[in-house]
Amino acid sequence: MKNILNRLINHETLSKQEAKNMLVNISNGSYNPSQIASFLTVYMMRNITINELAGFREALLELCIPIDLSAYNTIDLCGTGGDGKDTFNISTLASFVTAGAGIKVAKHGNYGVSSISGSSNVMENLGIKFSNDPIFLEKCIDQAGICVLHAPLFHPAMKNVAPIRKELAVKTFFNMLGPMVNPSFPKNQLVGVFNLELARMYSYLYQNTKTNYTILHSLDGYDEISLTGNTKTITNKMEGMLKPEDFGVNLLSQTDIQGGTTIQESAQMFVTILSGKGTEAQNNVVCANAGMAIATVNNLNPIQGFELAKESLLSGKGLETLKKLQQLSL
């Protein structure tokens, strides 16, 4: 580790294999917490390279506990987090709305690190059972249309890193990796990232896979469609720019999509919105993200996806999905 840290301090970069080896060694407990924290800090001070990101990703996927959901045409809606915006849980809400519209969802998530309440914090608060049992997860997909893949249960290799990330409480390269290491290897992905450079890296890595994907970055910094401005999109077919009017809605302000200040408040807000009792702004931003997921899977244009998402939300189908998952979790 000393040699690697000295090289990194001297502004050198790692090869893909070196990056992979580092993560494997971290997972094996080869380094102490101070060394791991120093290693993570390097990537807060300079941009990660494509080779480094690819190596880290390869290590995590090789070390993960895989779950076979290949019988289903699933999508994961997942953002990197780390955008510093503290929105409510938009991608998790959009996941339930997407499932309510009949699309199978394999939602990969974790506890919040740089935010107050991550996807797993809200799911746990609402009584959703975390499991890596394939029979239980298939049952969830079959009966509720969605399963929740709580990252620590599938990435035991990262147990040495979790407490350090929590103590640092800022985004690290693990934020960048989260959406890329879904252990069910979904056929479709809607991925939000916190900057344009990372969007390009994701595109470069995803174009060498069979994944049907849409990568999103709102130009004012959000790792999702925020409707507070335009959103850059990169798919396996094209690049584009989404405007709020592409969904037939008005521009929002940042305060319209602010999250709760506690996990409890975030969970209450989650249920309120999923019950169709959210503000128009909250409904629109959830349906824009769910709509893009639906459009990605079914090859539709954004407004077609948006209308299907809105029908799922306002008819109560999204809420019914949550209730089914809660019942299965008992």
UniProtKB/Swiss-Prot annotation:
Belongs to the anthranilate phosphoribosyltransferase family. Anthranilate 2 binds at residue 165. Gene3D superfamilies: Nucleoside phosphorylase/phosphoribosyltransferase catalytic domain, Transferase, Pyrimidine Nucleoside Phosphorylase, Chain C. Catalyzes the transfer of the phosphoribosyl group of 5-phosphorylribose-1-pyrophosphate (PRPP) to anthranilate to yield N-(5'-phosphoribosyl)-anthranilate (PRA). GO terms for biological process: L-tryptophan biosynthetic process. This is Anthranilate phosphoribosyltransferase. GO terms for cellular component: cytosol. Anthranilate 1 binds at residues 79, 110. 5-phospho-alpha-D-ribose 1-diphosphate binds at residues 79, 82-83, 87, 89-92, 107-115, 119. Pathway: Amino-acid biosynthesis; L-tryptophan biosynthesis; L-tryptophan from chorismate: step 2/5. It comes from Flavobacterium psychrophilum (strain ATCC 49511 / DSM 21280 / CIP 103535 / JIP02/86). Transmembrane segments: none annotated. The gene is trpD. The keyword Kinase does not apply. NCBIfam families: trpD.
